[in-house]
Amino acid sequence: MKKHLLALSAAAVLLAPQAVGAEGFSINEWSAEGFAMGGARMFAENDAANMAYNPASLTKIQGEKAKISVAYIAPHGKWKADTDGDDIFDDSGRNRVNPAFAPGMYYVKQLNDKEWIGMGTYARFGNMCQFERDSIVATSAFSSRMNGVSLGLNYARKHDEKWSTSVGAEINYVGLQLDKKPNGMPLHIEGTTYALGWNAAANYAFDDKNEVGVVYRSKVKHSMDGDYDFHTPLASWGGGAYGCVTLPESWSLGYGHKFNDKTRMEFNATWTRWSRFDAFDITFSPLFSNPSAGPMEVPQPKHWNDGWRYAIGIEHELSDKYSVMAGIAHDERGIPDDYADFMVPTGERDTYSLGVQYHDKKQTIALALGYMDVGDLNMKKHAGNMYEKAKMHDSYTKIVVLSYQYNF
């Protein structure tokens, strides 16, 4: 087991820079099966990705299993802007982002009839978007990238035939890159940070057909030390940049029902305290031309709203080797118009997904396809912007997830 844990730890470090999302802050594409069911997969049998969806369900795993997953995320979107305040959108463009990849790796071992241990690395938060560098919306942001990855370790215990619980620790990594042109002058900010979090989960089975579960994930407070470069027509300079941001806590509630030995359904609701993201203030080191001026803080209020995500998924076993899955999910919009910007330009989201799985005694292979319909987002002018108002519209994301699990 130690060999597998060390390998997974090393992989987490190597994969971290690639663990990014698309047009949202929150990522749920942790496995092909989970994505195929809309993220409603808290009670799966013998699935190592339970480490991500519901650690209390590690107790549903027999023996020792390892799983790897990768999600291909291709976002698309258009913008239009009012440049002179006449209520006419007279400039337009599109999200120019390249497709992103969100990997996940999981390892679970049953210690005895009562105890399990699991380890996983996956992306809980992430964002990546790009717009035309010389467009007017570049004054808000023409490139933003938040690479996020979590490395978690959980202990799970089956207390009796009805109760299972789990508790775990998390190391959360965030890498931030932001490029914008406030008042038309290029600014580049880049930094990385690590912080600790924790989680707890519990399942209760009413009988062999009905089960409920709850998962709590703690907030994670990051303090970033980075660097910046700023260019004006008269001079260019750089230095240190510092900022704090708190990634929000969440509660996930799930219900699972087995219609028979071949068909089951899950419902999931997740509440996220997005109001933790109330500001993204950055403090810059003194300018080299006037070091006596002291550090300069640039406030960036966000004031996001708490929100819910609802999902329903169904899984049907076609034979002893093949299963099919389908799901639908709805994410509420947490970004108010007054504080929206092109750093995270996403509205409410509806996701539709399908998947298929092959399984035998030694392995499972799964493929999921999905389409995410992203709602419009209106934006008002903020300090440094050279437009009066703007709007993201006609946004959508295509997603493909592939997973492979090996049973030792």
Task: Set out the residue ranges of the language-model regions.
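Residue-level signal for pocket-adjacent positions within structured domains
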Residues: 20-22, 32-39, 46-47, 53
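Gram-negative bacterial Sec-dependent N-terminal signal peptides
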Residues: 1-21
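Surface-exposed strand-loop-strand hairpins of Gram-negative outer-membrane beta-barrel proteins
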Residues: 39-46, 75-98
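Outer-membrane beta-barrel porins/channels
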Residues: 23-35, 86-92, 100-408
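Outer-membrane beta-barrel pore proteins
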Residues: 42-45, 49-64, 107-114, 159
